[in-house]
Amino acid sequence: MDFIDNQAEESDASSGHSDDEEPQSKKMKMAKEKSKRKKKMVASSDEDEDDDDDEEENRKEMQGFIADDDDEEEDAKSEKSEKSRHSGEDELDDEDLDLINENYDIRETKKQNRVQLGDSSDEDEPIRRPNHEDDDLLSERGSDDGDRRKDRGRGDRGGYGSESERSEDDFIEDDGDAPRRHRKRHRGDENLPEGAEDDARDVFGVEDFNLDEFYDDDDGEDGLEDEEEEIIEDDGEGGEIKIRRKKDTTKKSTLLESIEPSEIDRGFLLPGDKKIAKEDLPERFQLRRTPVTEADDDELESEALWIIKYAFEEGTVTNQADLDQDDKLDCIMNLDPSVYEDRKKAVIKSIKKVLQFIRVRSNSFEPTFIGFYRKEDIDNLLTMNNLWRVYDFDEKWCHLSEKKNKIYDLMRRMREYQELSDDLTAKRRPISDADLMDTKYAETLEQLTDIHANFQLLYGALLDDMIRWEKGRLTGEEEEQEYRVKFKSSIRNDKYQMCVENGIGELAGRFGLTAKQFSENLNWKKHDIEQDPMLPLEAAEEYVCPAFSDSDMVLNGAKFMLAKEISRQPQVRHSVRQEFRQSAHFWIKPTKKGRDTIDQTHPLYDKRYIKSKPVRSLTAEEFLFYHKAKEDGLVDVLIMYESEEDQDSNNYLVNKYLSDSIFQKDEYTENVEQWNSVRDECVNMAITEMLVPYMRDELYNTILEEAKTAVAKKCRKEFASRISRSGYLPDFDNNDDDDDGMDQHGARRIMAVCYPTERDEASFGVMVDENGAIVDYLRMVHFTKRTFGGGNNGLRKAESMDLFKKFVQRRKPHAIGLNIEDMECTRLKRDLEEAVADLFSQNLIYKPIPVFLMDNEAAKVYMRSNVSLAENPDHPPTLRQALSLARLLLDPIPEYAHLWNIDEDIFCLSLHPLQRDIDQEQLALVLSHELVNKVNEEGVDINKCAEFPHYTNMLQFTCGLGPRKATDLLKSIKANDNLIESRSKLVVGCKLGPKVFMNCAGFIKIDTIKVSEKTDAYVEVLDGSRVHPETYEWARKMAVDALEVDDSADPTAALQEIMESPDRLRDLDLDAFADELSRQGFGEKKSTLYDISSELSARYKDLRQPFQEPTGELLYDLLARSGKEIREGAKVLGTVQSVQYRKVDKDAADSMLPDVGEDGLFTCPCCKSFTSSAPGGIQEHMLGDSRQGGCPGTPVGIRVRFDNGMTGFCPNKNISSSHVDNPLTRVKINQPYYFKVLKLDKERFSLFLSCKSSDLKEDDLSQRDQYWDEHQYQADLELMKSESKKKTEANTRVKRVIAHPNFHNVSYEAATKMLDEMDWSECIIRPSANKDSGLSVTWKICDRVYHNFFVKESAKDQVFSIGRQLSVGGEDFEDLDELIARFVQPMIQISHEITTHKYFFPNGTCEETEAVEQFVREKKRELGRSPYVFSASYRQPCQFCISYMFDNTERIRHEYFKIVPHGVRFRHQNFDTLDRMMAWFKRHFHEPPIELRRSAIPAPQYRVGAPPAAPYYPPQFVGYH
């Protein structure tokens, strides 16, 4: 606004026009701008007619209770008005905004991810970068989404230089005719820091870089609608006239808009980056998610108590004991109870002191500085890991305090609104002092979440009214309004609010206890239940309304209201949460995709079926595997409170809240019983339907976060192990003749050899000096070939080894490193060692040079990185890999720090299988902690960082610095002749502030010897030690005292002398010196003095463990990393490499008799493969040399090779279940087979295998989880077998190509379903399920009965086509039409005649004997005579049964007949039609069947009930049964 007004005034002054002459549109615009700046509110009785501007103001007022994480936006708005300052202090987080917006149906615009160059708006607000800080109030862990961005401020695009310096930019050479244009310009880059243009040139590599291309010319004027420009034209008389025209306001594309924000971030060019670099505060303090803030003593005391509770004492839900050992307080573990409390108080005091160092602005010390230089203040009770944990939990405390203050202030405002306003609705539930105290003393984000959820339920609908009321008080224009309705309408349209609006809450208040009273009764019965005299439904009658039309609806609404309020009570939630987490169980079951995907190599193979496993038994990152599998659709995860035993015994969670009579009246009247039942329903609804699902999701997220934290800790531990050891340090004392007069000050020569995985590529060796710079390199084309290989391989190998020997003889490295790529590395290492030994034996080198196998992963990451390509553009990839390997052998820390670059190559390291599934910023945080520790422990040679690019990244991990401050510091050094002579120059020359200097000074070392060679200035010897500048005087005093010279002696000379003979420091009484310092007011400094003494004895002595070559289990893990993991019990595919023989005992060969075969030939008793016609040949074979065709020995097994280069042994007894003499009878060389790993010995690199089918089929039950669900496993196994069988059958059936309306390529089941929808006369012809040369014909007889017969095909042209001849029952047919007409349709017609007969039994089949006989008797009663009944057979389709009474005893006989193509066959006779059969039957029904007459044993003339299977009569044709 001010900018626009000023521009308008300048235009007026320059043009000489009055206000009246202003263009009307511009005057209206200015008037509108001024009207927007006025703070007034026009009261209106009709809110529905408010205009858009009023709604916009109301939205801004919402910021009074909605958190906005964008602190820069708050700062920019804080200067606008008193009102916005008031609301800005009371904001909640984005999650609260989402909740309230959801409740109020407010839509908000999504934040943009790209940097925006916004036009200057009417209100002249600065351009801001969206803040991605996670302020999730509803998460205890605080960072579920995990993509927090760097906190770099963004502001208005500033300029570099004055307006006069920019005047030439606008200069246009006048050609005499063209009009000159003078545009009123306002630079949008005035606020950019000094020197930013130079920085931009460095980043973009452009010498003529012009910042004008980054910003619009009219950046400050884009918000104006009517902008003008002056055009000076010649008036034709030698004069000039000025013409004002409207400027073209078309948006122009700028260079900055075309650049990705990430590219801009890399250059640290933004004003916020410059501010961070220049501010005298550690950069990590400024970039922390919740920045470090000032705190008073009371807050620090509370925070120290909170940290020791939640950081070191509070347990996790899952079992993380093994991983938490590094973070535990060793000083108070396993102490006697009498000592524990005193020690704990001392630890709390130390934690408070650490917090003072961090949060008191006069200190601002990082944890690393505290651990090194403030040991006495923490009484040596806290380790470095403990200090970082305190630092991390300080961030959580600040985050918690920020949220707590916002919630507390919101509740305070609501309470003020309740007390002072006339809103009767707001007064129904007053906020008490206890509610405010609960908020003030909340200790976890979970507690705050519960408080906030309860507040949202009870008071969320009143927030708009509260805002309007506060707005009226601020403006002084609030009009008193008379509330004409008892319940005000709410924006929210949920079920609870509907109940509130219709007064159902009054009925909920008559249940006997409020939700608050119920929660207070959980621990002890504090409140008695007030019993209502009316029955529940009678009481509900009083509240019937249009929305709740009957008493049942009213009562249900009241129950829902009370249940909702109970479920939001913080005490209830806390109680349910504790119960749920203590006893929760989970179930795991693989999905169909999981059953096919999870094999023995999957980490969940032995844990894929889990039943009722307690959540507390989960360990480390186990649950993250389940979560990842669930996200991939491999398993289903179910979490429940009750175990299977609890479910069987009906022991549910809600019973704990129903059984204690918390909400029960102890009376037995009908009224009380009904109310007790209603109360139980409320509690059950609150617990089971509302809280349990919420707690299930919360628990899931909690244990998932714990699993992710476990992965981060394991990554930290693995990373720490890689940088915890120093580089190789040669023994210079015994190396005098080897250096040829070289300066031995750190002069190490390291060589590394790398061979590629592709054997046809060349291998490379490289030599680096003590600075990691390349001295020389070597190319060996045939290094990977074998010395005794076939053809010319041996000669080519010798050529490469000769090159290697000459290189070593010339360069004389102190050590040689070889990459661990696969198992070949062990052979190649032997080749190098033999070459070195050969040189030493010939006296070509003065001592043996050690050869080390080295972890190759970091070197390969560097090889593939953009950084390596930029630094070594002319070197092939393998040479770049060798360079990195040599630097790792020299010192691993600079090389790992080198990977922490703008491309984040450090995350390409494989530290854990699940490292990609956790928050990458969380991973970066823990890795940076370790790197900061080790970098500062080693010290940073700042001149080396300025000189060598691969050392540069170490500087950002120096205590107090960061990437921005390190970049800024290096620029200052480069401007200072690339040399820092002393630590004091960091302040004088590089302008480091006192706080940053205090943090970093002790860890920045100056190589005093090399600096002395480059400058004549005084060099402080202590600058090359860990002694901090604040204690230099004490170090000098110690040197003078140790030499026992006069105090007037030169302390510098004393220091030089004491460093040459440090043994004299042992005579110093440092304890007395410490006492003297304490008396002088310096405090306890004993540890500091001892550290100074140690440092004077050996300046910057490497405190890391010495370099050690990987061996044993570690070497095995590195070798096995190239392929799939091999573990005991696993089934692995391997290739048979050779047969293993046991050598022949030459002495016992004479006593061994050859075997004689049936053919008369003699067989060798050892190898079992050589035969001879005479025993002498066998004897000669056994005594001969195996390399010349002699007996190789007795075969004992086979040697197997796996894809990762590992080899294993499978003995004869494990090849087959039967006896095996010669393995080659069972397996073949170079053929792959599956083997089971029975035993794995990592120390000896041996695998003991078996390929017996019995071993391969069996799973290793010992590896299965304790809670393995065997029942579900077996059920799924049967299901998989069934599916596999169906799939096999489907795949084996040939799809037929037959053009006929009755033919379908379907199965029998599908055909029956189709027939159910078709007419009775239809049939389906389909492929036979058993033979490709056959068809099946199916038709429906009656309900559930289908007839099916086989048709044989012959004379087929193709397997999928129909045969030219079809045969059924001895009859042949030419085509399907003839088959249907002559064979199928006659039988269908007869069967239809039977099923539609008036005496047919339609309600079942003949196998249902009792039902058929009952139907016969019903027909007899109906007809008055003995009837007969037809029924179809289910077991034998196409056969029917006739049931009838054959005498006066009402006994029923059942006889079977069947239909044939030419009629009906009954009692071994054929009948053309059913009528003829029945005519014959009526004449002979009293005669027994032939089978009964032929029986040898007298049998009854009747049979009661149907037989187990219908009697079978041999048909006259075959094939259609």
Curated annotation (Swiss-Prot):
Subcellular location: Nucleus
Nucleotide-binding in keyword set: no
InterPro entries recorded: HHH_9, NA-bd_OB-fold, RNaseH-like_sf, RuvA_2-like, S1_domain, SH2, SH2_dom_sf, Spt6_acidic_N_dom
Chain intervals with Basic and acidic residues compositional bias: 77-89, 126-157
Residue ranges, compositional bias (Basic residues): 26-41
Listed SMART domains: S1, SH2, YqgFc
GO CC terms of this entry: transcription elongation factor complex
Expression by tissue: Abundant in embryos, and less abundant in larvae.
Disulfide-linked positions: none
Short motif (Nuclear localization signal): ranges: 26-42
GO annotation terms (biological process): nucleosome organization; transcription elongation by RNA polymerase II; transcription elongation-coupled chromatin remodeling
Residue ranges constituting the SH2 domain according to the UniProt record: 1300-1389
Pfam families: HHH_7, HHH_9, HTH_44, S1, SH2_2, SPT6_acidic, Tex_central_region, YqgF
Positions with biased composition (Acidic residues): 45-56, 67-76, 90-99, 166-176, 191-200, 209-238
S1 motif domain location: 1183-1252
Family per record: Belongs to the SPT6 family.
Subunit organization: Interacts with glp-1 and lin-12.
Known role: Histone H3-H4 chaperone that plays a role in maintenance of chromatin structure during RNA polymerase II transcription elongation. Required for several aspects of morphogenesis of C.elegans, including regulation of division in the germline and gut and specification of ventral-uterine precursor cell fate.
Protein name: Suppressor of Ty 6 homolog
Source species: Caenorhabditis elegans
